[in-house]
């Protein structure tokens, strides 16, 4: 194991806390067959990033993470305690080792990031972001801010982390979010995936749902779609009562728009 990797896996140290010798943990035995494997829904965005998925909430930002600016370019730690933007990666590739951090939740809003060199990201008085802190204080804490499917990292001084377009250095100089402040924190942790079991015909509003089922079952000899012109409130009521499919079938049969209805 390299010095970089060895440093990256150490625990969070708060300022004023004494260092304790780590104790070896016994490996937990895998309970094979104790739980069924969950069905996986493919996250196309994660596939393009080597399996690293984008955090949607602050709770997602924990453990092994990367910080992406732009498309497949990640914040990279350097051995002088500074950060730069790494070179763009090919589709399907994940971040390099120097582009991988460990995130430690401070509370339900803020996190601290430790580089692979074992130092915490800190906002300096001049706006530079450095990685030279041995422990976490206020200046080492960052708040992920989410708005309209975009994210930015807010420092203790009220400035957002960004990449300087002049030299690709990591800074936090602006109190408003622009294109250079928008980023994504990505994780490669395993996660529970919500399986989409809704039939494709039932996506959209009830008017679209009815059209979808007509397309699926209608006899198209004359190439004309026959839609029941009665108010869709009938469908809303049927959905609330759990009889949507029966009502849709009845409406199609009245229009002779179902090849299975006589």
UniProtKB/Swiss-Prot annotation:
Short sequence motif named Bipartite nuclear localization signal, residue ranges: 239-255
Disulphide bonds in the chain: none
One Pfam match: FRG1
Compartments it resides in: Nucleus, Cajal body; Nucleus, Nucleolus; Cytoplasm; Cytoplasm, Myofibril, Sarcomere, Z line
Claim: rRNA processing is one of the keywords in the record: yes
Disordered as annotated region, ranges: 16-39
One MF annotation (Gene Ontology) recorded for this entry: actin filament binding
An example Gene Ontology biological process: heterochromatin organization
Cross-referenced CDD domains: beta-trefoil_FSCN_FRG1
Family named by the database record: Belongs to the FRG1 family.
Protein name per its UniProtKB record: Protein FRG1 homolog
Organism: Drosophila melanogaster
């Amino acid at each position: 194991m390299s010095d970089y990797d060895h440093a990256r896996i150490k625990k969070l140290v708060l300022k004023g806390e004494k260092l304790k010798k780590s104790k070896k943990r016994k490996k937990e035995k895998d309970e094979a067959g104790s739980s069924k494997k969950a069905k996986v829904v493919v996250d196309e965005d994660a596939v393009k990033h080597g399996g690293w998925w984008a955090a949607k909430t602050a709770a997602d930002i924990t453990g092994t993470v990367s910080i992406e600016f732009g498309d497949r370019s990640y914040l990279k730690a350097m051995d002088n305690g500074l950060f730069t933007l790494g070179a763009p990666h090919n589709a399907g590739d994940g971040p390099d080792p120097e582009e991988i951090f460990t995130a430690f939740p401070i509370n339900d809003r803020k996190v601290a990031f430790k580089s692979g060199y074992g130092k915490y990201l800190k906002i300096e008085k001049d706006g530079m972001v450095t990685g030279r802190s041995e422990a976490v204080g206020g200046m080492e804490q960052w708040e992920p801010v989410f708005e309209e499917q975009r994210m930015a990292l807010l420092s203790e001084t009220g400035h957002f982390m960004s990449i300087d377009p002049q030299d690709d250095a990591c800074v936090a100089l602006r109190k408003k979010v622009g294109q250079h402040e928008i980023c994504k924190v990505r994780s490669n942790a395993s996660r529970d995936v919500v399986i989409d079991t809704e039939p494709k015909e039932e996506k959209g509003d009830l008017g679209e749902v009815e059209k979808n089922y007509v397309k699926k079952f209608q006899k198209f000899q004359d190439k004309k779609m026959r839609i029941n012109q009665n108010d869709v409130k009938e469908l809303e009521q049927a959905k609330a009562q759990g009889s949507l499919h029966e009502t849709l079938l009845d409406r199609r049969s009245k229009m002779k728009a179902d090849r299975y209805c006589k």
